[in-house]
Amino acid sequence: MPRKKTENFNFEASLNELTALVEKLEQGDLTLEESLQNFERGVGLVRSCQQALSDAEQKVKVLINQDGAETLVPFELETKTD
């Protein structure tokens, strides 16, 4: 189930938890039930992280008005040359 939009979502903490779950699953020491519970939690975390990345991508896009039509243009990071 995708996460509900909330101000309390922490992408980095979710990614760290997902990494820990993967490590547990890779060790192979869990029972089948524990593995399924961890897998289910991991799927939820992946979906939440994907949604957070999608939301961030939308925020980065810049709305430009061209010829009276609104157009979404991807944000391009300026590279700094020293």
From Swiss-Prot:
GO terms for biological process: DNA catabolic process. Keywords: Cytoplasm, Exonuclease, Hydrolase, Nuclease. It holds the Pfam family Exonuc_VII_S. It is found in: Cytoplasm. The keyword Cell membrane does not apply. It is an enzyme of class 3 (hydrolase). GO terms for molecular function: exodeoxyribonuclease VII activity. One of its GO terms (cellular component) is cytosol. It comes from the Bacteria. Signal peptide: none annotated. It catalyses: Exonucleolytic cleavage in either 5'- to 3'- or 3'- to 5'-direction to yield nucleoside 5'-phosphates. SUPFAM superfamilies: XseB-like (SSF116842). Its EC number is 3.1.11.6. Bidirectionally degrades single-stranded DNA into large acid-insoluble oligonucleotides, which are then degraded further into small acid-soluble oligonucleotides. Heterooligomer composed of large and small subunits. Belongs to the XseB family. PANTHER family: EXODEOXYRIBONUCLEASE 7 SMALL SUBUNIT. This is Exodeoxyribonuclease 7 small subunit. It comes from Coxiella burnetii (strain RSA 493 / Nine Mile phase I). The gene is xseB.
